[in-house]
Every structure is written in structure tokens, then in C-alpha cells.
Amino acid sequence: MKQKWIVLIIICIGVFMSTLDGSILNIANPTIAADFKINMSQIQWVVTAYMLVVTATMLFFGKLGDKVGSNRLYTLGFFIFTIGSFLCSMSNNLSTLISSRIFQAVGASILMATGLGIVSNAFPANEKGKAIGITGAVVGIGNMSGPVIGGIILEHFGWPSIFIINIPIGIIAVFLGIKFLPKPVLDEQNKSFDIPGLLLFASCTTLILLAMNEKGNTRLYLGITALIIFLLLALREVKFEQSFIDLPLFKNRNFTVGNIIGVACYFPQMAVSFLLPFYLEQLKNLSPMMAGYVMTVHPLIMVLIAPIAGSLSDKHGAKNILTASFSFMTISLVGMALLKADSPLYLLIVCLVIFGLGLGAFSSPNNSSILADVPPQKQGYGGSFLATIRNLSFALGTAFFSSFFAQSLTYNQKFKSHTSAYVIASNQSYWIAASVCFIGLILTVFFMRKTDKSIS
């Protein structure tokens, strides 16, 4: 087997472990809360602390990987993630579990920050899309299999086992990484590190994510503080020659446009992920298990489409594939915006199939297009930047749609029945999501540069 495919397998192990860990934990949270005798507002910090650390540090580890070697850092990430998993499994109270999750999150952040750049450097230009598409499919498999595997583990072995399963996989991955990951391409031009820029960026992202978990004045104060820190960061990065934010990369049109349309894809996804389970269980009266089956429709389609979309983008360029992707997502969200309480379930499933086509056709062509404009010695930074954008978009999308839906529902209940108010609030949310996707479509059509794959 050629080394590039071994490299891809090693990266996919890390992708699978990190996505599986997150999706399993969502299922295990109620069990852990009952075991520790705590409420759900307390157990949410097991998830929130992990998300804060990952999002705030990914860009740092991406840049660090370019300087010291992404392969070394990736292997270290596996080691830290594995040790963190062991510590989580041994936790006997909430504070210990949160501390262990923070340690584990450092490893996960390294894996997410450096993995995509390693894959991009390992494959030639005409195979990058296919390779990145395979990693996208693994993300979908991890997210889909998490609830199933988690349910089996919780029923037969208890919640510590959801962390124990990471340990043997992690040990194998560490040895594979040491033996097979290629010699790194280092960024020799800039060995210095913008520590103040790093601290400002980490503080800004942390405050944004904390604000998403608060309400009222606390959210407002955190948001204002985050804005002030962002302005300070912007002023510093413009004036400082060797800045933490790699501003020269934004001169590349596809790098800039690709990250902007990333927001237009990932932000609206949360309307579906957050609101749809409530629609299925409360308005369609489906059991949680049946609702779960319905919610696997679009991830399943995504798993099937992602590698195909990656291969097509290698042959025909990313722009046409991304145009189709946003068209599918916009159409599907408009369809969801037209659903009523008594709409047949098959109409929703059709919308989810179309939505899955759009999602599956997005990530690998867009990631490939972004990284094609990034020099080999900066691939770690490029991959970590788009991963940071993705995480922030998910967090902001969840906060926005949950808040908007709740406010719309409360307002409309003054004039309508609960069911009618629910449908109105849901439809309005999907119209907003569709509008954001349509903006992504416009940006793709008019601003993304069409690459000549034959030259690549």
C-alpha cells in the first residue's frame, strides 16, 4: 500500500475517534448526570469546556504544526487524547471529569488542527478532493454510529466505557503515526510566535462561546467584551508584521471566499440539527428512537456523497460542485420552511435527502479549494483556520436558532394555538437558514475563482 493511503488511514482514525467521542457523549450525558447526582445545566459543562478548548486552540496548534512538524504534533495529539480518555474513564465527580475533558480536548484540538493539512500535503493536486472527501465521509460515520455504539455501551458496560474504547485505538494510532507519517514541510520563514495575538484570539473565541451559553445581561456583557477584544486583535494584526492571523493568505480569493461560504453552510445546519428533533417528537409524535432514525437520513446521504463530490472536484474544479451544493441546501430548507404540522413525513424525508446531497457535496470540494491556495508549509494553519470557522459557525448557529425560535414561539403564542405558533416559529427559522444558504450560493457563483484542474 502506498504511503499516502496509510497516512489517510491514520488521519481517518483520528477523525473517527474525535467525532465518535462527541456523538457518544451526547447520549451518555443523562446517565453521567444521574450517576453524579447533578442536573443538566451542570453536566453541559462537560461538553462546553471541551468545545471552548478545541475552538480557542485549534489555530494555535495549526500554526505550531507548520513550525515544528505536523506529523510530530499529530502523533502527540493522539497520545494526549488517549491519556485524556483514560482520565475521563477514571473520573468520580464532575470537576474531575471536566478537568479530564479539558486535557482530552487539547489532544482533539491538535488532531483537528493538523490532520487536514497532513492529508493535503500527502496527496497530489488531482487526488486531494478524493482524499478530503473520504475524511468527510468518516466524519459522517462517526456522527451516525455514535448514538448506536453509545447506547449499546451504556446498556451493557456503563458510561466510563465510552472513554475506555478510545484507549486501544489511540495506542495503535500513536505507533502508526510514529512509523508512517511523512517528514513534515516546515515554515522556515517565520520561527517567531505572536503570543499576544494568540491570547487575544483565544480570549475572543472563548467569550463568544461563553456568551452563547448565557442569557440576558450576562450574554450582552460577554458579547461586548468579545467585540472589544476582537477590535484590539484586528488593530494588532494589521500593524504587527509576523501576526498570529496570517493576513497574506486572505489575498488568495478562494481562501477568503471559501471560509466565508463555510459560515454560510455550517451556520444554517444548526436550524436542522437543533429544531428538527423537537418537530418530530412534539408535532409528529414520533418516539425518540424513530426521531433518531429520521435524523440519520441526511448524515447517511452525506457519507455516500462526500467521496464522490471530492473526486468530481478533482476532475472538474470545486466551483460547480459548490454551486450545486448550495442549490440543494437552499431548496431543501425552503421545503422545510413550507412544512406544516400535518405534512406527510415522507415530504420531510425528501427534504432531508436533498439536504444531505448539499452537505455531502460541500466540505471536500470547499476544503480542497481552500487548501489549494495555501503554501505547503502553511497547510496546518490553513486546515486549522477552516476548522475553527466551522466550530464557531456551529456554536453561533445553535445559539441563534434556539434563541430566535424561542422568542418567535413566545410571541406567536399570544395570537395562535401552541401548534400553529410552533409551526410559524419553525418555518421562520428555516426561511432564515435558506436565506443564508442562498447568500452562500451567490458568493460562490460570483466571487469564487474557477480553478483549472488540468493545470493542477
From Swiss-Prot:
Domain of life: Bacteria
Keyword annotations of the record: Cell membrane, Membrane, Transmembrane, Transmembrane helix, Transport
UniProt induction comment: Expression is probably regulated by riboflavin, via an FMN riboswitch.
Residue ranges of the TM segments: 5-25, 45-65, 78-98, 105-125, 134-154, 158-178, 192-212, 220-240, 260-280, 289-309, 321-341, 343-363, 385-405, 428-448
The keyword Nucleotidyltransferase appears for this protein: no
Annotated family: Belongs to the major facilitator superfamily.
Record's function text: Transports riboflavin into the cell.
Descriptive protein name: Riboflavin transporter RibZ
Phylogenetic classification of the source organism: Bacteria, Bacillati, Bacillota, Clostridia, Peptostreptococcales
